Amino acid sequence: LLAGFCLAGALSAQAATQEEILDAALVSGDSSQLTDSHLVALRLQQQVERIRQTRTQLLDGLYQNLSQAYDPGAASMWVLPANPDNTLPFLIGDKGRVLASLSLEAGGRGLAYGTNVLTQLSGANAAHAPLLKRAVQWLVNGDPGAATAKDFKVSVVGVDKTATLNGLKSAGLQPADAACNALTDASCASTSKLLVLGNGASAASLSATVRARLQAGLPILFVHTNGWNQSSTGQQILAGLGLQEGPYGGNYWDKDTVPSSRTRTRSVELGGAYGQDPALVQQIVDGSWRTDYDWSKCTSYVGRTTCDDVPGLSDFSKRVDVLKGALDAYNQKAQNLFALPGTTSLRLWLLWADAVRQNIRYPMDKAADTARFQETFVADAIVGYVREAGAAQKELGSYAGQRQQSMPVSGSEETLTLTLPSAQGFTAIGRMAAPGKRLSIRIEDAGQASLAVGLNTQRIGSTRLWNTRQYDRPRFLKSPDIKLQANQSVALVSPYGGLLQLVYSGATPGQTVTVKVTGAASQPFLDIQPGEDSSQAIADFIQALDADKADWLEMRSGSVEVHAKVEKVRGSIDKDYGGDVQRFIRELNEVFIDDAYTLAGFAIPNQAKTPAIQQECAVRGWDCDSETLHKLPGTQHINVDQYAQCGGGCSGNPYDQTWGLNPRGWGESHELGHNLQVNRLKVYGGRSGEISNQIFPLHKDWRVLREFGQNLDDTRVNYRNAYNLIVAGRAEADPLAGVYKRLWEDPGTYALNGERMAFYTQWVHYWADLKNDPLQGWDIWTLLYLHQRQVDKSDWDANKAALGYGTYAQRPGNSGDASSTDGNDNLLLGLSWLTQRDQRPTFALWGIRTSAAAQAQVAAYGFAEQPAFFYANNRTNEYSTVKLLDMSQGSPAWPFP
């Protein structure tokens, strides 16, 4: 009995300690000692119920038994509660969109509509007038049933005064013009009974001024007067009311309305629960997670399982997404919830998720670990980054090991200078956040650029939570973009830590930004600037890599940035480069990155085109050096991680790869090529979506054999089968259709990959023969890239003749659709123009249709017809074995055994 008593007492003391920790964390955000997630959930439930009761009482009194009908139209904005303790929806459409909201912020009373409802009360929204009247009476008197005095003074600012006063009269009220600006004039505010604001309002520190008026007891009615467009002024006014503007487009697409059939009970229910999800809170408190999901409905594709078709799962996921969106709105605005009034419930959500993270253990399985899986699924969506203190997630699974937890951070401010290479994108800062440790960041003058900071670069598919026992890392490693204002410090704490990225838009390409960071950790980071001596940067990188104190590294070279697990890079260096880091870095720059951008003909700083390319451009009067026409594309990011967004490698920006980073690798150049391929160089659009990108690894493999004697991927191009398909197809009554059916008709993503590649290599062999120089063969694709960018961007009338489009009045289309001939046409014209031969016979040989306009243009050149040809080979990289077959008189025998 005594032992039992002592145990109970110890547990009680522990619970009390957690209560105290929770009370303190609600003020500071410091959840590092908070481990009792159930305790936090109970407190959250109590707070949610208090909010529901307050909302229910207010809304029930406002609605009475009046019509709920309301239609703001498509040209309107959503107005959302931001601080849930003190704000609430007033009108929620049938699609769940908030069309008007109420505010009790700062002890005042506010109401905001997503359209100028005051101009609609005598027309489309006449039925809404009685409800608006009660709402205004509540604003002015604090009681929706208490009539406003006759000639109560209304100050109208930023919206048409006459229309506003007439609108209030249409609602059955008797307003009088205050004839002064209660927003900026304190004496006017003291005598006015209502302030009506529109998007035309202005004041110094607008949000703070609105809040001050509210706090002083002046009721505020805001009407959005900017249609479905967002408005900076509106956003500031709403922020002062504790509300927020909806996303771009507002109600334009949803056209949400409150139907006349809506009941008072239903509206009260919707408003009371909005943004709180009491049912989800109840699940968390009770641990009553659903256990009967039909996981057999999940599907798998290239190694990744998805469960979108599991009945009921999407509803659960959407509810969690709503919660995530509400909290991320604060992250994105760099607002610390623990410093904002009216956010107790949101703070409790964050602290609950923090406490859950203290106890997460990987891996988990959706079927075998039902409760843990679903609880973690919710907690993963709830992260508060902007705060002075927080907690680290103790186990990070396949994302990072224990050494990330113990990385030392800087105790003093570091100054970093970053160059923004394009108008928008993101770039590595060169530092990282350590889990649970406070980091402060600020930027100095950014010019006209808008800046934000982000952590990590993984796409959501890099967490394979639906795969069997593969929920083995946090679900949202990449943070939202957190806004940065010039010379204003933002404090961040991440439970996971991660690589810091500067996100930018509206920048002047080439401009520099100074970033100041305190409390950051240093990962191995290599920054190679074109044309600069990088020897010290390389030495520092090698030293950091050899120290082996980080799980992640970054490398920036030209237009490529690599964000990689150290083991994925270290493994390749040791296995493929004998531990020679210098050689690895040199080939990363020259063989992988430079090779691709040079082949595509971009204007690379401090690097001239080859004499052969320069001569071809000069002869044709082409502008091949313009940094406007041929500017390097925006930064290509590469994630090298345990998992990819799709399969083992997944294109995009970033592109993902799961294998070790190898400068000579096929997959690296294949994925990079996806972001360099263009519609004008595709045969049948998407039918060569996995083909036209492969000129980049093909060129690299040819170069690696020639320069290093290593023969890689030597069976990639299937000349033999391509030839066989052509021979069979041309035996039909319609040869072109016969070959098309065999070679191009199959829409499969990877269909006939090696055979279709043979078309692209034909022209390398042809150009090498034409120039009598095997080293110039690949120049044809550089010239075609230079050609297509001029077709795309140069002054059409001035340059079309020089580009071989003299008969085209308008710039031709650029469709990537498989049914289009846009790419076929451009290839026919470009190749005929460059080779000074009519290449229609060879295009027909390959089953490639072209338009009448393209054929007429080629005929207008007056070039000699090039008889149909086929370059045969039994190797991919060795071009000395290539044999030319004349296809104009039949189908010669295959020239290899």
Where are these regions (language model features)?
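Activation corresponds to long, low-complexity, non-globular regions
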Residues: G250-A392, D551-G571, G579
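Beta-strand-enriched, solvent-exposed domains that form extended recognition/catalytic surfaces
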Residues: D380-F525
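Catalytic cores of extracellular degradative/oxidative enzymes
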Residues: F541-D769
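Active-site-proximal alpha-helical
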Residues: A273-Y293, T299, D308-G312, V562, ...
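Exposed low-complexity, polar/acidic, P/S/T/G-rich flexible segments that act as propeptides
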Residues: G498-L499, S505-G558
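Short alpha-beta junction capping motif
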Residues: S103-V117, A129-W138, A146-S155, S187-S232
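Beta/coil-rich, acidic/histidine-enriched accessory regions frequently appended to metallopeptidases
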Residues: S314, R347-L350, Q358, Y362-Q404, ...
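Catalytic beta-strand/loop cores that center a nucleophilic Ser/Cys/Thr
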Residues: Q18-G107, L121-S122, A163-L173, N181, ...
